[in-house]
Regions:
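A conserved ligand/cofactor-binding region detector
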Residues: 2-832
């Protein structure tokens, strides 16, 4: 194995074990190390090994290199005694790691050569890696992009989450119905994660609280008679881009405090003997267990506290390595809460400071509020997390006491600001009096943090003026905006290498770490030769997606058609149903008037619905049934194709995004916090049809209004329509025979083999005057805008020009910019 011993100079307090192996990264050394891992780690004969074996061995080889750099990075952290960031997220949707690591290490050509010497192609090898099932949607993918930028900007930080054994679920489509299967991403193990024998932390649940006096006579709470679960750390390494800086995500796995209860086993009760083990380890099995019943809700709460409690024991362990006052805690520790899932961390830190460290309330609260910052990710009131007082008191009795005390002291502040205003106190309270009584986790996160940020300018303004208006009045300096971004390393350099090469050849490589340099593409939009090459690359990407579609669905699509794409979580507010209505309208138009003047389209959907979200699953069914009718109607003659790709994930997105011509970002204005899919599509040269929602507004500002297809109401207009409707869905139908025909065709069973009841719930929701997502009120505008899209696509040269200008305007939407703002404006850490 090609390893050199690198002697590391010893600093005071270091020992003789401080030498770190140095791994050569030339092609011959990489090849030798691949062979070593085939033999030593897998027991495989190199001459009989297949692509999956090579993939695993290459992954271990890359991990060896990363570990070396990670150890050096950690030494730098400790030597400089810098403040560290702890990013707490229930999701990290990182996708595949192999190609990303090869690119960020800057050894692509050497790895290609090493793999070629073994008779394989690197791209083919990378296809054998499983996506890490550690997240679901935008929340987790944002966290993953953040980790990439944190490493690239050399910020001392760690990501903390859960190592899910099965992730969310593997989505299969059976007769158009979503079927959830286990996502067994770890069935062959993972080359990228490694278990740590230490530190292992106990996490407490249930029990009750007693009290005793300390030596000074002060009240001290004791949480006793608990059920304990052990948290085992598992690390996954994240490299920065060509900077030798590697950080880690620490993911926790739940294990029983006792593997086997021998008393049960001895009595022949074999199920009882392992019952505790099974119950404990369920905590880290699945992301977002269904919460439609009390057992599911309890498991979700236990998941959230499990990873928070283990994380804070780890933070305390690191903080205490050298004796120091807890007054220094906020100077050494910054904790970012990614949504409300980890908000239970606020009472947990208070518990540690009060009960374990013996601090007084005022001191502990001052330390805690200076430590935490909270990112809000939703404008949907129903998505603002709440736990019943009964459940939280059962699972975490001490934390409920602390939350009540936080609330009591907070409401005293409110009373000073709004004296004798009981209604205002009720509105502010962390405790919703119900019934049932509930803990408002967003309120807890706001009260317990020094910073609350939205993730787009519109989102933040709506938080200040609508969702948390009173909190903004009480804490005017606490709310701020940090528009989301994406990492260009993953979403252009890796996923679209041909386009990345074209860009680098013409404007240099600086854009990879300074995305603002894409502005230098603007003059090239008027260069005919550049546009032609751009189109050729787009066509090649579309051929790749067409091949993928055929392999996974059996549907043949033409790369010459417009690839009109909507891929994201299936939810009513994201309005996949609106897209479906346009499909039916377009289908009717082709049947009546032929295809003259209509740009051929392939409309691609992908995304998962929550297992218990039956209406979202019904939308999937309708889209699949529309496809079944349209794709098999000879009168359409291939001018319109509908595809629903199953099991959407990061790797699938890396194929879809570069191939898209049109990006559907059509949520009801005022419902999407930001979105990042919109950014990924634009960065890959897709034009957007969208509403003035989330980051769409800022994308439109950056790429130019003339290069964005806008439709629909604004957030203000949408809110006005909900409060004082100017028209009803039925009136929309009465004024448009075309729209009436679309709705009637669904209602009469045209897409359900004559079954008029199957999609009746969707028809009823469309015609409901109280439809909060306002599909029918935006439909006319959407159909008209789609006509403009079709006409624009026919002029291929101008479409390409618009696509180039979209890419040129994407500089703002790098997570490098986002993380720099977090670091300097929230965490108080200057970026070099």
């Amino acid at each position: 194995m090609k390893v050199h011993q690198k002697v590391v100079s010893k600093s005071k307090g270091s020992d003789s074990r401080s030498s770190v192996p140095h791994f050569d990264t030339n092609a011959s050394a990489i090849k030798e190390n691949i062979i070593h891992h085939l033999l030593s780690f897998q027991g495989r004969d190199p001459e009989r090994s297949g692509a999956p074996d090579i993939c695993r061995a290459l992954s271990y080889t890359m991990r060896d290199i990363l570990v070396e750099k990670w150890i050096e990075t950690q030494k730098t952290f400790y030597a400089k005694r810098k403040k560290r960031v702890y990013y707490l997220s229930l999701e990290f949707l990182i996708g595949r790691s192999l190609m990303n690591s090869v690119i960020n290490l800057g050894i692509v050509e050497d790895v290609k050569q090493a793999v070629a010497d073994l008779g394989y192609d690197l791209t083919e090898i990378c296809e054998n890696e499983e996506d890490a099932a550690l997240g679901n949607g935008g929340l987790g993918r944002l966290a993953a992009c953040f980790m990439d930028s944190i490493a690239t900007l050399k910020i001392p930080a760690y990501g903390y989450g859960i190592r899910y054994e099965y992730g969310l679920f593997n989505q299969q489509l059976v007769n158009g119905n979503q079927v959830e299967m286990p996502d067994s991403w770890l069935r062959y193990g993972s080359s990228w994660t490694f278990d740590r024998p230490m530190p292992i932390f106990p996490v407490k649940f249930y029990g009750h609280v007693t009290s005793e006096a300390d030596k000074q006579g002060n009240y001290r709470a004791k949480w006793v008679d608990t059920t304990d679960v052990m948290a085992l750390p598992c690390d996954m390494l994240i490299p920065g881009y060509k900077n030798d800086h590697v950080i880690n995500m620490r993911l926790w796995t739940a294990r029983a405090s006792r593997e086997l209860d021998l008393s049960y086993f001895g009595r022949g009760d074999y199920i009882g003997a392992v019952e505790s083990k099974v119950s404990s380890e369920t905590i880290s099995k699945v992301l977002y267990p269904p919460d439609h019943n009390l057992a599911g809700q309890e498991l979700r709460l236990k998941q959230q506290y499990f990873f928070v409690a283990a994380t804070f024991q780890d933070i305390m362990r690191r903080f205490k390595k050298k004796p120091k006052s807890f007054d220094m805690f906020p100077d050494r520790v910054a904790v970012q809460l990614n949504d409300t899932h980890p908000a239970i961390a606020i009472p947990e830190l208070m518990r540690l400071l009060l009960d374990e460290e013996g601090l007084g309330w005022e001191k502990a609260w001052d330390i805690s509020t200076k430590t935490f910052a909270y990112t809000n990710h939703t404008l949907m009131p129903e998505a603002l997390e709440k736990w019943t007082v009964e459940l939280l008191g059962k699972v975490l009795p001490r934390h409920l006491e602390i939350i009540y005390e936080i609330n009591l002291r907070f409401l005293e502040q409110v009373a000073q600001k709004f004296p004798k205003n009981v209604e205002m106190q009720r509105h502010f309270s962390i405790i919703d009096e119900g019934p049932p009584k509930q803990i408002r986790m967003a309120h807890l996160a706001i009260v317990g943090s020094h910073s609350v940020n939205g993730v787009a300018e519109l989102h933040t303004n709506l938080l200040k003026t609508r969702i948390f208006k009173e909190f903004h009045e009480l804490y005017p300096g606490k709310f701020n905006s940090k528009t989301n971004g994406i990492t260009p390393r993953r979403w252009l350099l890796q996923s679209n290498p041909e386009l990345a090469d074209l860009i680098s050849t013409n404007i240099g490589f600086g854009w990879i770490t300074d995305l603002d340099q894409l502005r230098n593409l603007e003059p090239l939009a008027d260069n005919a030769g550049f546009r032609q090459t751009w189109r050729e690359i787009k066509t090649a990407n579309k051929r790749r997606l067409a091949k993928y579609i055929n392999e996974h669905t059996g549907i043949s699509v033409s790369p010459d058609s417009m690839f009109d794409v909507q891929v994201k979580r299936i939810h009513e507010y994201k309005r996949q149903l609106l897209n479906g209505l346009h499909l039916i309208h377009l289908y009717h138009h082709i049947l009546k008037q032929g295809d003259e003047g209509i740009a051929p389209r392939t409309v691609v959907f992908a995304g998962k619905a929550a297992p218990t979200y039956w209406r979202a699953k019904l939308i999937i069914k309708l889209i699949c049934e529309i496809g079944e009718v349209v794709n098999n109607d000879p009168r359409v003659n291939g001018r319109l194709k509908v595809v629903f790709l199953p099991n959407y994930n990061v790797s699938q997105a890396e194929i879809i995004m570069p191939a898209a011509d049109l990006s559907e970002q059509i949520s009801t204005a005022g419902t999407e916090a930001s979105g990042t899919g919109n950014m990924k599509f634009s960065l890959n040269g897709a034009l957007t049809i969208g509403t003035l929602d989330g980051a769409n507004i800022e994308i439109r500002e950056e790429v130019g209004e003339e290069n964005f297809f806008l439709f629909g109401m604004t957030a203000e207009q949408a809110e006005f329509e909900r409060l004082a409707p100017s028209r009803t869905p039925k009136q929309v139908c009465e004024n448009s025979p075309e729209i009436t025909e679309v709705i009637d065709s669904i209602a009469k069973g045209a897409f359900s083999k004559g079954d008029k009841q199957l999609f009746k719930p969707l028809v009823d929701s469309l015609l409901d005057p109280n439809d909060q997502y306002l599909l029918m009120l935006d439909l006319e505008s959407y159909l008209e805008c789609q006509r403009k899209v079709g006409a624009a696509f026919i002029d291929a040269d101008n479409w390409t020009r618009m696509a180039i200008l979209n890419v040129a305007g994407m500089g703002k939407f790098s997570t490098d910019r986002t993380i720099r703002q977090y670091s300097e404006e929230i965490w108080g850490i200057p970026v070099e």
